[in-house]
Amino acid sequence: MPEEAGFPPAKRFRPGSGPPSRAGSFPPGRQVVMLLTAGSGGRGGGGGRRQQPPLAQPSASPYPEAVELQRRSLPIFQARGQLLAQLRNLDNAVLIGETGSGKTTQIPQYLYEGGISRQGIIAVTQPRRVAAISLATRVSDEKRTELGKLVGYTVRFDDVTSEDTRIKFLTDGMLLREAISDSLLRKYSCVILDEAHERTIHTDVLFGVVKAAQKRRKELGKLPLKVIVMSATMDVDLFSQYFNGAPVLYLEGRQHPIQVFYTKQPQNDYLHAALVSVFQIHQEAPSSQDILVFLTGQEEIEAMSKTCRDIAKHLPDGCPAMLVLPLYASLPYAQQLRVFQGAPKGYRKVIISTNIAETSITITGIKYVVDTGMVKAKKYNPDSGLEVLAVQRVSKTQAWQRTGRAGREDSGICYRLYTEDEFEKFDKMTVPEIQRCNLASVMLQLLAMKVPNVLTFDFMSKPSPDHIQAAIAQLDLLGALEHKDDQLTLTPMGRKMAAFPLEPKFAKTILMSPKFHCTEEILTIVSLLSVDSVLHNPPSRREEVQGVRKKFISSEGDHMTLLNIYRTFKNLGGNKDWCKENFVNSKNMTLVAEVRAQLRDICLKMSMPIASSRGDVESVRRCLAHSLFMSTAELQPDGTYATTDTHQPVAIHPSSVLFHCKPACVVYTELLYTNKCYMRDLCVIDAQWLYEAAPEYFRRKLRTARN
């Protein structure tokens, strides 16, 4: 609440009244079932304010009685009988329930206890791997069983299930991979599509795959497949219509009033406005009331965390101490857990988070939310072929979700760092990823599933024809496609690419590596790029980080530097003290080793020769150039960079080891757009290698540029 903002009188609402998931906003004729839960309608007694333990937090007590009492205290428990009666008789259902109501942990258990799993496994999909793992851990605790037995999980490169598993949490991408070999999903009796409102690219494809499997099983007289779509908020009419007019079940949850404040004037610097808001709240509110701030990404969060800590050291006497905690997906797991723990006496928790705190987790103690109204999201331009991460406005639905974090346990306050007029111009719903992302991976998966015509696939929200054609063109350039009888099919190379749980370009990189005798090195590099950041870069210790990293830096770029770090990590046996001294995330680096082992196994199953370059760095760089040729840039006469094929202006990201260098030509892994378009994860290459890799492609691009 910046002083210059001049907040108007507060507007009150009850959590859920803003988004279109409330019963009052359902269209006439839609079947809506209101399910009474603890804390709604005056029911719930003394337990009405108990909270579901956060996803990543272990159960509060090792004693079965305490765990069972916790289950019974959840808002959803009051509706258990009604829910089972409804779900038992429905093929499809859309279920809406507030974050923290217990729906994700309890619905699978209710279905299992009601006998739904006798004819097949109950699958629960999640957009994020951390949620799938922690939810499976929590539910296995509640069922008093070893993880991997009755309850298990499957995420990319990690399968903790057995023949006994009846409740299986998995990422949406992993269920898609299973559909490649079994399009009917025969092993499942029920698929629960959780956090459906996030509309990730994998989730949207999964909607169509599950719907088709359900229909086909019915046509073949197979055991029916039950499909339940769950979320804290969503466009229920769209989901209900898509799943054959599925009834909407609404869990009436605990609702506490929240005051919403807007700024009087637009804020040019949302980071400064957020900082001012935090310290005004901190100096006026009791220390027991915690603050949640929404920013866009790791760099912003770490920078603001440092600034908050520095300012907090110089506050006047009598002001509470401040415990500043960052929260983002690539943060080491142990540090993520800290947000769920209570602050020491006399301290206020200030949690600075990405949108991971919108719906995926429940954090207790939050009284104030500071919403910058910004989020980092992918955008794809099929004309230029560029996919970038860009900071943009949230949707109205996201804004209401953020606001609702303040009303989990008691009345709350949300400070929106934008005007009410600006809010009214926000998109109603978040644009699905499938309409704003590169679709090459999607098309490869659909073709691997032998979908007859990818252009007519039953998407809930259809991507533009330009996006689909651009994806097909990319796969064609990678040698993955061929045309047979007016139909697209996969080439032998394409089928091999689909066998890897990777982006097509990285799968192609591995498959190209035997030609350059560097498969061992490429497996390591691709594994490093497939895992959340293995490097920890606290802004407060920037000079120290640069000092210890000097010994690893390669003049050939970031890929080779990461390769050097991984080799040292392996040579020292994954020493955790070494990781700490060198600002390396030991957990993520261990995961890299596991990912690498699985990718290597896939290569061996294909009878691929696996050789090492034995220190020949050029062969590794040539391999990267031959497979990532669509992600390259060249130095221009004025000292700037432009992409090789579309001549889009780009710059080297400050985090790159090449930031102070001017190599003539580079290959990059990712583009990030902030104040300009930055390339991340770079490798120095020779421009001539690109023309060797795709001569016709670059000749065509050169002609277009001249014209």
UniProtKB/Swiss-Prot annotation:
The lineage of its organism: Eukaryota, Metazoa, Chordata, Craniata, Vertebrata. Residues 471-562 are annotated as: HA2. The keyword Metal-binding does not apply. GO terms for cellular component: cytoplasm; NLRP3 inflammasome complex; nucleolus; nucleoplasm; nucleus. Gene3D superfamilies: 1.20.120.1080, P-loop containing nucleotide triphosphate hydrolases. A motif (DEAH box) lies at residues 194-197. InterPro entries: DEAD-box_helicase_OB_fold, DEAD/DEAH_box_helicase_dom, DNA/RNA_helicase_DEAH_CS, HA2_WH, Helicase-assoc_dom, Helicase_ATP-bd, Helicase_C-like, P-loop_NTPase. Residues 1-80 are annotated as: Required for nucleolar location. It comes from Homo sapiens (Human). Residues 39-49 have a biased composition (Gly residues). This is ATP-dependent RNA helicase DHX33. CDD domains: DEXHc_DHX33, SF2_C_RHA. The gene is DHX33. Residues 84-252 form the Helicase ATP-binding domain. Residues 277-450 form the Helicase C-terminal domain. It holds the Pfam family Helicase_C. Residues 50-64 have a biased composition (Low complexity). A motif (Critical for rDNA-binding) lies at residues 547-558.
